[in-house]
UniProtKB/Swiss-Prot annotation:
Protein name: Protein NDRG2
Function: Contributes to the regulation of the Wnt signaling pathway. Down-regulates CTNNB1-mediated transcriptional activation of target genes. May be involved in neuron differentiation.
Organism of this sequence: Xenopus tropicalis
Gene giving rise to this polypeptide: ndrg2
Subcellular locations according to the entry: Cytoplasm
Gene Ontology biological process terms in this record: cell differentiation; nervous system development; Wnt signaling pathway
Amino acid sequence: MSELQEVQITEDNPLLQDPLKAAELAAKLLQVQEQKHSIETPYGVVTVTIQGTPKPKRPAIVTFHDVGMDHKMCFDTLFKYEDMCEIVKNFVVCHIDAPGQEEGSAVYPPGYQYPSLDQLAETIPCVLQYLNFPSIIGIGVGAGAYIFAKYTLSHANTVEGLVLINIDPNAKGWMDWAAQKLTGLTQSISDMMLGHLFSAEELSGNSDVVRQYKASILNSPLISNYQLYWNSYNSRRDLNLERGGGVTLKCPVMLVVGDQAPHEDAVVECNSKLDPTQTSFLKMADSGGQPQITQPGKLTEAFKYFVQGMGYMASSCMTRLSRSRTASLSSEGNRSRSRTLSQSSESGGGPPAPLAEVTC
């Protein structure tokens, strides 16, 4: 037997002790582990990006982006936020890009018949079947929020919860349609999409975020594809949601909108049409039209409570914000009593306790 030799191993990168650096490393590892799939559906090819691996007895977190952007532009800031690493490691995450909206997509020829939002909602079953996801928690923004709501109305048994940011469940009325036509005579498609994404104050202030997204839309080779998705959004049908009626979302729902955002009134109206025992309403101050981009920390905390209320991540560490946030229920219906947000995370195996209405 040959003589054993002593080998000294020097660690080039010592273990990280800084939590922030550890979170950054985890985020980088997740990026390395990303998997992309192109999935054929009856309404075109959708590209999905997977982070992590499916967890037994846990739903997948599935996202759907708004108009004028792909999943990276819409969700990267939120999912790369350090505290989101804690959530991502507990679930598999699937980002759906609407047909023709992802970076590197081919430009559609003139006259291409783009799917309606109702048809885009029917691409989700194809994605879930392809990836073998039995149930999901959906996170949608703008058009993506509408698509998830529409999907859930037809496939409620596969949806455990929804986070709907900037949702407008109503069809455009004749006055809205006429105003849109007149606006189209004086504004470019990029200006109209920016007016949908950001508040008037944000646009006039021309913040770094606004400048970044304005440049991204203006310089995109996919601007004609963006317009097709935009046209489908503006042609959406009324979801006809009704509190206590036959058409409603029966799973836990967290509605999110920025204070003074373009869609604030629409989200408030949507809140009035949903079951108050299943619905949380988060109005975020200083977040503008895209709270998942401008206030990822606050949204992450709210989302942690949301999934804890569903019985997941019961042992997760809460930051000072989540421990101390005080909320009061809406005065509508039975939502007149007050409580702190921490009470909503005490749910065990019983029905999910809704978050309270919060302004933060």
